[in-house]
Amino acid sequence: MLYYALVFLVVALVAGALGFGGIAGASAGIAQILFFVFLALLVISLIASAIRKA
């Protein structure tokens, strides 16, 4: 699960870089939303992993 969260974070970072950089100006809003969604998924996954180990 943590692996998928990291993969999605990388995808969101790439989408964010393209969206924020002006290359794909029309999709900047979507990239911002995806970035924060996958960042939240990463945090949730990290917390769930820490709880399982405890």
From Swiss-Prot:
Segments traversing the membrane: 5-25, 29-48
InterPro entries named in the record: DUF1328 (IPR009760)
Membrane topology of the entry: Multi-pass membrane protein
Protein localization: Cell membrane
Alphabetic keyword roster: Cell membrane, Membrane, Transmembrane, Transmembrane helix
Superkingdom to which the source organism belongs: Bacteria
Chief subcellular location: membrane
One Gene Ontology term, aspect cellular component: plasma membrane
One Pfam family linked to the record: DUF1328
Protein family: Belongs to the UPF0391 family.
Protein name, as recorded: UPF0391 membrane protein Oant_1245
Organism name: Brucella anthropi (strain ATCC 49188 / DSM 6882 / CCUG 24695 / JCM 21032 / LMG 3331 / NBRC 15819 / NCTC 12168 / Alc 37)
